[in-house]
Design a protein with these regions (language model features):
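Phosphate-rich ligand and nucleic-acid binding surfaces
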Residues: 5
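Conserved PLP-enzyme active-site core in the AAT-like
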Residues: 11-14, 18-32, 37-174
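N-terminal "arm"/small-domain region of PLP-dependent enzymes with the aminotransferase-like
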Residues: 1-2, 160
């Protein structure tokens, strides 16, 4: 029997079992492993799929990378996989002015460096119009303002993709 480290995630066992069963039939083999081996690998798959999607209409040129990404800074609890030195490295463009990765971090409150300053974040959304917004942290002290950001994203043109890597809080949500 599998051991799930987060409470409230037992349903994942059922989903994984169904997937394993279907993959065994599809591949015609007795054993398959359908789980990714790490958060880095999982987020690499997401970032790769996004770059593939934004380049779907032009396969002749060098693929365009994600123009701007907004995330939690690693020092403020952000996960390594969503950083330019992590899985995001090969999928984010460079800012033509600074020549650094085109990543803007969520601003935080002056009196609490681990809590997002939502009004300031909304202003940055309007300024940068990131293609991808990554929520989720390795160090969780406060809940992420998913609903507030989602409402603001609907007003952007083009609309940003909101990704919530909830691996560390899934058991609390589930």
């Amino acid at each position: 029997a599998e051991i799930f480290y987060y409470q409230g995630t037992e349903f994942i066992d059922q989903v994984e079992s169904l997937l394993v069963e279907q993959m065994r039939l599809f591949l015609g083999c007795p054993e398959v492993e359908t789980r990714v081996i790490s958060g880095q690998m999982a987020n690499t798959a997401v970032f790769s799929a996004m770059v593939d999607y934004i380049n779907r209409t032009d396969r002749r040129r060098e693929p365009r990378r994600l123009s701007w990404v907004m995330n939690n800074h690693i020092i403020r609890g952000g996960h390594l996989s969503a950083q330019p030195m992590g899985a995001l490295r090969d999928f984010v463009a460079r800012d033509p002015i600074t020549e650094k990765p085109a990543v803007v971090n969520f601003p935080v409150l002056k009196d609490n460096p681990y809590k997002m300053d939502v009004p300031a974040a909304l202003a940055l959304l309007e300024e940068y119009k990131p293609e991808l917004i990554v929520l989720g942290k390795s160090m969780i002290i406060h809940k992420e303002p998913v609903a507030e950001l989602r409402r603001a994203i609907k007003e952007l043109s083009p609309e940003s993709i909101l990704m919530y890597d909830m691996a560390h809080v899934l058991g609390l949500i589930g």
